[in-house]
């Protein structure tokens, strides 16, 4: 009987030790914070602005031209001949449709490029996290945005990941 109580005490003690060790192998990080502060993100923003600069300028010119024609139609429409007014209206409709199509295509391509570049940065972050986790023997790495609460004894590796992002 004494041996059973003694063995039960040892089993409970070992279970508590494993629980404490498991908590030490769980870490958190803030992916959004790392992403927002990365130098790569700043570079990508500048690169994409440069890449789409000419098309954005073209769309601005088209929009300005459309507004000018619409103002002309509103201002002089009553005094124009019917054929001139009809021609201007058809021109406006065609130009507005062309502008709309170009703007939609621009937005789609810009969004696709932003997504592509964002995914590259996130992939870089995840590779760094994986390397840190392997090096430090962490079992689980959790994004702080996916957790409602975590105790202060859980290690946060956000700064370590951010520092390695600066090096790359």
UniProtKB/Swiss-Prot annotation:
One of its GO terms (molecular function) is unfolded protein binding. Molecular chaperone that interacts specifically with outer membrane proteins, thus maintaining the solubility of early folding intermediates during passage through the periplasm. SUPFAM superfamilies: OmpH-like. Belongs to the Skp family. Residues 102-113 are annotated as: Lipopolysaccharide binding. This is Chaperone protein Skp. GO terms for cellular component: cytosol; periplasmic space. The gene is skp. GO terms for biological process: chaperone-mediated protein folding; protein stabilization. The keyword ATP-binding does not apply. InterPro entries: Chaperone_Skp, Skp_dom_sf. It is found in: Periplasm. It comes from the Bacteria. Homotrimer. Keywords: Chaperone, Periplasm, Signal.
